[in-house]
Regions:
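Short, intrinsically disordered, low-complexity terminal segments
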Residues: 7-8, 32
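Bacterial signal peptide processing site
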Residues: 16-19
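Sec-dependent signal peptide recognition
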Residues: 1-7
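GH16 jelly-roll
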Residues: 22-315
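C-terminal motif of bacterial Sec signal peptides marking the signal peptidase cleavage site
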Residues: 12-14
Length: 315
């Protein structure tokens, strides 16, 4: 029995309470993948073998197998960062335990050291933050261009939660650098939703063109009332033609990269998703409020658990 087959068998046997597997077809039709049932209640076993995919090599990964602080591959955003969100980002809300990265949203009051009385800047005008959380990024350690990215995670779905798996380009100003949202969960059109998006530059500074997929959360809970209690597998397949985003092998959005050229501000007519100048780094965060809605205080603390992050690239 060859080594790759042994690795795949080991991975299949170690996925929590998972027992089945499903054959799915790769987006370019060139190979078949055996994917484990990702909807188990537990993370994968510590130090389980990472599966191989035909035609791909594992370029980067974090299995979160070592309890304590996240590895030095990750850096942290600090304080109030974006979108008028309620949380104060800080390192100590992120830990690794029992084979998972755990980002905890807390209802706690912390002073804003940057407070300026009378300021019109939302980041400065708040004397306190009423919530805390963490946002981790590989901006200083890893970025990639084309490939397959997988994240197995269990997300909080209480009102006010805004968990995300996303990427930003490592050059140019937003949104000309290109944003990829593999996962966002928040209130959209008055109802909880799972989103899979990308955006790029429009004609004005900080103006974005969005390709947005919005799937009502009820779509998932109608099939499994315990959906929010389980881990799920988010995947992005990205090449020079398309970007395809999945959850548990269900296609959420397929974006034609012929349509994603910046519209004329800086980086005029560049395409952030196919440009050889650009790579994208990873962010994992749990925002509170903002698009997430008014937080349900009774649901705190909130836990966003990430079993692993894996990036594969074609040979």
């Amino acid at each position: 029995m060859n080594a790759i087959l042994l690795m795949v068998m080991a991975a299949l046997s170690s996925c929590g309470s998972s027992s089945g597997s499903t054959d799915i077809e790769d987006t370019d039709g060139s190979n078949s993948i055996v994917a484990t049932d990702s909807t188990s209640y537990k993370p994968t076993e510590k130090f389980a073998a990472v599966p191989s995919y035909d035609g791909y090599v594992l370029a980067w990964h974090d299995e979160f197998d070592n309890d304590g602080l996240p590895s030095k591959e990750w850096s942290f955003e600090q304080g109030f960062v974006r979108n008028n969100e309620l949380q104060w980002y800080q390192d100590k809300n992120a830990t690794v335990a029992d084979g998972c990265l755990v980002i905890e949203g807390r209802k706690e009051k912390v002073a804003n050291p940057n407070y300026v009385e009378g300021s019109e800047d939302w980041k400065l005008q708040r004397k306190y933050a009423e919530y805390t959380s963490s946002s981790l990024t590989t901006q200083n350690s890893f970025a990639f261009h084309f490939g397959r990215m997988e994240v197995r995670a269990k997300i909080p779905t209480a009102t006010g939660s805004w968990p995300a798996i996303w990427l930003l380009g490592d050059k140019w100003e937003w949104p000309n650098n290109g944003e990829i949202d593999i996962l966002e969960y928040y209130i959209k059109n008055g109802r909880p939703s799972i989103l899979a998006n990308a955006c790029w530059g429009d004609k004005g500074q900080w103006q974005a063109v969005w390709n947005e997929s919005v799937t009502p959360f009820s779509h998932f809970t109608a099939k499994d009332k315990d959906w929010s209690k389980k881990f799920h597998l988010w995947r992005m397949d990205w090449d020079e033609n398309y970007m395809s985003i999945y959850v548990d092998d269900e296609l959420l959005n397929k974006i034609d990269l012929k349509t994603t050229y910046n519209k004329g501000y800086d980086n005029n007519y560049e395409n952030p998703f196919i440009s050889n100048e650009m790579k994208h780094y990873i962010l994992l965060n749990l925002a509170l409020g903002g698009n997430g809605g008014t937080p349900d205080v009774s649901a705190f603390p909130l836990k966003y658990q990430v079993d692993y992050v894996r990036v594969y690239q074609k040979k």
